[in-house]
Amino acid sequence: MEEKRVKCKKKLTSTIGTWKYIQACIFFAIILISNFYGLKSFTDGFLLRRAVLNQTSLCENPPADVREWKNSSGCWAPKIFERAVIVIIDALRYDFLIPYNDSNYYHNAFTTPYETSVLHPENSYLTQFIADAPTTTSQRLKGLTTGSLPTFIDLGSNFAGTNIDEDNLLLQWKSLDKQIVLLGDDTWDVLFHDYLNETLSQPAFSFNVPDLHGVDNKVNQYVFDYIKDANFDVLIAHYLGVDHVGHRLGPDHPTMRDKLNQMDRCVKEMMDLLDDSTLLIVMGDHGMDNKGNHGGDSFDEINSVLWMYSKKPTFGYLKQPGKVLSANQVDLVPTLSLLLGNPIPYGNLGTLIPEPFYYYGDEYLSKAQKINIGQLNRFFSEYDLDASDFLSSSVHKNNNSYLDQYFLDFDYARDAFSYFKAIWAEFSLFPMIIGFLLLIIGGFNLALLMQDKSVIFRMSANMAPSVMKCLPVCLILILANNELHSPFPAEFYVLLPSFYILLNSFNQKLMEYFKGFVKLDYFSIFITFLHVCSFGSNSFTVWEDRLCHFLIITIGLVMFCKCFSEMSPLFACSTYSALAFILLQVISSYVTNCREEQGAFCVSTYISTPDNSLRTLIVLALMALSSIILPLILQLHLRRVLGLSLKLYHLSILYFFELISSIFWIAHHVFANDALLEKQYHHVLYSLANTYVICILGVLIWQFFLLSRSKFAKINVIERSYFVFALLYSFLSFLQRPLGHLSLFSCFLQILLLIQLKQWQPSVGHNFFSVTLGLLGLSHFFTTGNQAAISSLDWNFAFIHSKSAENQAISAIFMFLHTVGAPILTCISIPLFSFEPLSKKNRFLINLFRFSFSFILYNLLISTSTVFFAGFFRRHLMVWKVFAPRFMLSGILLVTHQLFVLIQCFGSSVVKFPEDAE
């Protein structure tokens, strides 16, 4: 009976203890949620969407009075063509069509447009076609049909497009009962489904990057018969093969030449089938860089091409002194509108491409431009009522010749375009300031808690009062805010609980607070200060990969010197670990994927396209070797540091997953260099990938279940934690290319070395190691082929599990894990730093919370710095190329780290430690 009562008492004590830990986790979550709202508030003010006007241009309401054209065949101007065939070749760069004396595969393969323009200039017009970032397909189609400028934040809708709700070309054609037929890229169907002829249209899934020919073959199956039958008014044929070859293999690959040759043959056949009343337009929606990407960072990524062809003479070339033959993509909208006889969409910002109108004389061109200017002025007046001074600059003088007046109107239209690009970069300062303050307060809260040795007791004690006092007040204020239509955003009210927590935590004297620091903690503060300040310089931000390597090597040297100051029995082991840490970082620093701004000062060594070079084969061999030695190294680490060892079946499971990973990437290399093998056996890769993912997720779920439900001895908890960490590393490394796999393996080894140094140098505080860990994750973010630039994303990992990415959620998860694999790896290693020999659960959780606070604080300071400088330099020339992408990366990493840290804290609170198992 007595024994039963003791067991019940222990069980009750354990339950109360677990609830106390969960309360501490909830309190921690409140702080992290306030950080999230800080990022959200700043983002809402910084990345604004432009206002969309609902007005629509009407046929009976022309913007300018051109009396001679009142009874013409078109709405506002005479119709020149009855039908149009619009051929979009995705990612078709301008120089792909221009002859070059070199051996690049993408040159001299698509020659028909250039040759026709040279031989028959009155029938053919070829020009550069300049896109505006963002250069995702969805945003480019919006620009090509509305004549407007999608904003930076609209980039994300490329993967979840919605119907366009502003005036556009397809709406205008539909209002005139024109039959619009789509073949190819289904992005058109997502954006303009209501306007398309459902019977004739044949949309094709667009995100299947590994499929180089499927969409193009489907287009060719119908397009030639449709042109021959002429049962359409507007035929849109959107080819994707060039874009997919660029993404998968890069532009300078034999497959690109084959694809461009195919496009050349298609265009020739279309030309033969045209009649005199049909206009053929061939264009790209954007270009690509030398790796096949098109984020919009470089000129090659926005430098597309436009070619127009007609069997009847149509084009007259206007001599403009000092003007290069080029057009903005928005210029197609008014040009195509007047050529086909429909109104120009209301929100258009483009100006006429002069050549199709100048063929009919300078008077005709001037009158057409007058309509364009009238449309621009009408939109201008509606959108910005304070623009009267600017509107008066469009002056029509009676003594001007038609051509002189055209040039005046052309310059005016270009100025209007530039003006709107400027005003759509306006920012809302109030939510930006609120967001910045929330991040600052969150930083103070974490800084105060990380030095508190009774942190779990304090957090669990403060959780209930914080919620009870702040929640009702916040709810009342938010409801009042909605009723009174207050300008304050909801994030403003998150300041209240954050500020309350700060005041409640600020109960230590300042000197007592700093007494908790050790010497190397001050050095880590100095390193953090340097990193935080570096974001004030666009050069340091661009070269952040080198800066991170420098800071980590500096930290390694300090650890090496620290070993000499404490001549302990483990002196030799500590020095060897510090030297190995430095050596691994030096080797990793040679793996880099350059960004455009680094120019000729950087040479990319990251292998993104597999080939049969000796370097690639060596990397594959080293990757296989790392898979073999990984379990052995983990076993050696456990024995040396904690006197433990992995069970045989744990080692066998690790070997199994590492073997599958190596086989997958070796097979991937073989198939990538043999098109015939890939065609026959590509399904083998997808089977391997899916087998790997399903099995490793099953093992991970099994291990988490055991840790939360079973009663283990202390050594089993630690051993299983290391096993789970190794499994997660294996999963993340599987989602890397071979060289990225080696970089992540280096990161894994460096984490183990840091754990050794922490155990063997107990006088070094946890703040030092948490800052080192944060820097290490960021450093290997760069060595795994990434940069703080959209163009560095490797989209192939969205298709690692399947030839089709119709399940976009799974594809997005794989892309995310590939991109931020290294920062995630360092984050999930935090519990391993919290274990101490013979420590109990309470001690482990205190270590875990304090280490987590310090780790999140470092990342929060980085995010706060990028937030501040992105806001401070919001008018800087490089804001959208340097400061904004870095702020977005910091925000993503901070949210990711907070999520994983919370999961770890909640999970650790329910792990069965030995004192629970008695």
Curated annotation (Swiss-Prot):
Q: Please give, as recorded in its UniProt entry, the membrane topology of this protein.
A: Multi-pass membrane protein
Which keywords does UniProt give here?
A: Cell wall biogenesis/degradation, Endoplasmic reticulum, Glycoprotein, GPI-anchor biosynthesis, Membrane, Transferase, Transmembrane, Transmembrane helix
Per the record's keyword annotation, is Membrane included, yes or no? yes
SUPFAM superfamilies in the record = Alkaline phosphatase-like
One Gene Ontology term from the biological process aspect of the record = GPI anchor biosynthetic process
> InterPro entries recorded for this chain?
Alkaline_phosphatase_core_sf, Phosphodiest/P_Trfase, PIG-O_N, PIGO/GPI13
Q: How is it modified after translation?
A: Glycosylated.
Give the main localization category. Answer: endoplasmic reticulum
Q: Which residues cross the membrane?
A: 16-36, 429-449, 459-479, 486-506, 523-543, 547-563, 567-587, 616-636, 651-671, 687-707, 715-735, 738-758, 762-782, 813-833, 853-873, 887-907
Residues annotated as glycosylated are: N54, N71, N101, N197, N399
The Gene Ontology terms for molecular function here are:
mannose-ethanolamine phosphotransferase activity
**GO CC aspect terms:** endoplasmic reticulum; endoplasmic reticulum membrane
Q: What is its EC number?
A: 2.-.-.-
Judging by the UniProt lineage, the source's domain of life is Eukaryota
Q: In which pathway does it act?
A: Glycolipid biosynthesis; glycosylphosphatidylinositol-anchor biosynthesis
Q: Does the keyword Protease apply?
A: no
Which locations, inside or outside the cell, does it occupy? Endoplasmic reticulum membrane
Job description of the protein? Involved in glycosylphosphatidylinositol-anchor biosynthesis. Transfers ethanolamine phosphate to the GPI third mannose which links the GPI-anchor to the C-terminus of the proteins by an amide bond. Involved in cell wall biosynthesis.
Q: Which family does it belong to?
A: Belongs to the PIGG/PIGN/PIGO family. PIGO subfamily.
**What name is this protein filed under?**
GPI ethanolamine phosphate transferase 3
- Organism, scientific name: Schizosaccharomyces pombe (strain 972 / ATCC 24843) (Fission yeast)
Q: Which gene encodes it?
A: gpi13
